[in-house]
Amino acid sequence: MEKKIEAYQAAVQKGILLNANEGYANLSDEIIQEIAQALPSIHFNRYPDNSQEALLEAYGKVMGISPDQLLAGNGSDQMLGLLIGTYLGKGKKLFTFDPDFSMYDYYASAYEAGVEKFDLKEDGRLDIDAFIAQGRKDKVDLVLFSNPNNPTGHCLSVDEIRKITEAFAPVPVVVDEAYMEFSDEVSALTLINEEKNLYVTRTLSKAYALAGVRVGFMVSSQENMKTMKASAVPYALNSVSMKIAEIVLGHADETKQRIEEIKARRNAFCEKVKDFRRIQMHNSQANFLYGKCADKEKLLEAFDAAGIVIRNYKGKDTFRITIGSEAECQAAYEVLKNFEEI
């Protein structure tokens, strides 16, 4: 019987783009010039360095992680796919949140695995004890969730992550930290050396403004990474992507400044919309805001009329808005404000 896998809906590319949680601005002219000067050193006729040595050293230096605990791939999506393919298959079960990142379902379906979901509370929070109880009852084979959560923006504490990881051991627990740079919580990376069933994925697509380059990482214990590296597709990253990533990772100050600007803009946006009645917006620890509106279709029409593209969750009364530039956020706020006052 032929499998039916629902296609992932890629982001729209026209208008004011506040739908894909990308960086709102391109890299600085200084970094772009450095990249241009580095291109002639690349041997385009040769396969890329499969050891990923320079890239893993650069990322490890920034994150304070040993390179032998790292693996890079074509976006963190590929790392998630590798983990799901390793631990799941026909008759196996993935356990995740609802709502959460839709690619988890996509990969699980591709490997003919089942997906068990646990509903988050109305405010995006998790009932951890109930989550653990359901997962144990269902005898799941892999636990996977984003933190901060995509789309709610809520972030679990490192102690909550530890509780989940220890409760499910030896079942693998994967924490997708695509948006962790925007959070004030402590990363699950601090648990890597003590929780042997824990994996963390990271990306350069969000905080590092490299969505167009597609570089992501998997992090775990040295023992786990030996197994994962043996299973990984060879030459997963091209030479150009690796070189660009290495250069950007060398400009930590610029990345930090960008992150702080986005966090400040996000917090200001949250403050302005917190008392709205027609629209309910969640506080967020990511680079986006999650909202709910009973009359969402009319709200979407208002955004469309303003030339602003936001993320619409079909079949639900929810939506998500990326924190863009100051002008983009103001334009999005004006749509919400005008809708609120109708």
Residue spans for each PLM region:
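PLP-dependent aminotransferase class I/II
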Residues: N26-S28, N197-D275, Q280-M281
